[in-house]
Amino acid sequence: GMGGFGKTTLLKQVNNNFCHQQHNFDVVIWAAVSTLQDDIGKRIGFSEDRNWKEKSLQDKAVDIASILSGKKFVLLLDDIWEPIDLTQLGVPLQNLNDGSKIVLTTRSAGVCDQMDAEKVEVSSLAHDEAWKLFQEMIERSTLDSHTSIPGLAETLARECGGLPLALKV
């Protein structure tokens, strides 16, 4: 979905839940697209290996695949703008049959299609939900400071079109 719907916020909450709760995955990896292979390498133990940092992309992919092939993992990818060949980076897609998961956020349905990903659409909030979120973002004393403010605030919340990011900013 378009920007401001809360895709990144949702993915961060998923990541935080994995960090603070018991789960049945061997490793949870949050990776930025720009440094995807290095981020994966860090999470599986290659961060201190100076030799690994100097390896080619293909050699890193072999190393990543050798570690992840024996693990049940969750790979969280935020803000994907174009399709990524994860196998080329060393991500063993056959593990998805054994319960590993890859979750990505994107603004492009086409990226989901090209990566054969199941789509979960996020949409704007209904007015009641948007108004509730807006009220949580401002002090109650501000709303109560003048009789015209609640009406103006509700109009402003409506103008945000139910986009969580717009309501928070």
Q: Which residues does each predicted region cover?
A:
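Conserved catalytic segments around the Walker B and adjacent sensor/switch elements
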Residues: 20-35
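Walker A/P-loop nucleotide-binding motif
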Residues: 1-11
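Central P-loop NTPase core of STAND/AAA+ ATPases
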Residues: 31-94, 143-148
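Short, conserved phosphate/pyrophosphate- and ester-handling motifs at nucleotide-, phospho-/glycolipid
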Residues: 7-8, 78, 163
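Non-catalytic, charged helical/coil tracts that couple and regulate nucleotide-powered enzyme cores
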Residues: 40-55, 98-100, 108-169
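A conserved segment at the C-terminal end of the G1
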Residues: 12-19
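Structural recognition of the conserved hydrophobic beta-strand(s) that form the central parallel beta-sheet
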Residues: 76-79, 99-107
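Conserved catalytic network of the ASCE P-loop NTPase/AAA+ motor domain
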Residues: 22-23, 66-70, 93-98, 113-114
